[in-house]
């Protein structure tokens, strides 16, 4: 898989400010397909990539790694959307968008008060979650902002997610909990601080900081920042309709396999959580999905 550069860029962000990408970077990006997940196999492959990369960094604990895929109850919601980058039909990057719901969002577990403050303002939230890239393709130990191929792979995944959010949803504000070492990347993408560093049990007790992005304000900030490359990528250029088409709809069989059999997330969920899922899928027979004799039946 000919992705790794012969050397690491020392000014990978220059192209974003100048507005023109080097030829080798344009060629690399043309070889990648960016789109939404369309099948169960793709969702599993994306979840496996997340688990693999998170395990390298100590973000998953042994007790939640036995299935070797990283899924949460939020992945069962029909509004949740997973985006992927494919090279020769293999997923090499992924990110997931989790719109707010009665179940909240994952980072409510440590930033509930701050997020509730945004909700009271009328903000319609969605959390950016489960970002992962196949690091073995780009060389190890290299800061993301100094590797142009890896950086632009992430940026194009975010571009697709931004377009989906801006044009196909009513979401106003993106939120994310990230390791402090990644703060610079999100500042570069016009995310602002929401709350300071806290221990995140959901990431194996690693530190996290909370950041938010106002979608309307970000467009104006991007225009004013004189970063022509970012403006062209994220504002002027529009994702193609086929990149966002045929989004996967989880079937009863998918729900049973992924969340009852593969991960046991449904059996471990509260009755209230299962009731909300039943409301999301009113035609589905949840007694069958949960298994005979489930305590939720």
Task: Annotate each language-model stretch with its function.
Residues 2-4, 20-71, 79-84, 91:
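Short amphipathic alpha-helix that is part of the acyltransferase structural core
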Residues 198-259:
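Accessory, usually C-terminal, subdomains that scaffold auxiliary metal cofactors
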Residues 101-107, 111-217:
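Acyl-donor binding region in acyl/amide transferases
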Residues 63-80, 104-117:
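Short acidic (Asp/Glu) patches
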Residues 1-14:
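Extreme N-terminal leader/anchor segments
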Residues 265-297:
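C-terminal non-catalytic accessory extensions
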Residues 90-94, 126:
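Glycine-rich phosphate/pyrophosphate-binding loop shared by adenosine-nucleotide-utilizing enzymes
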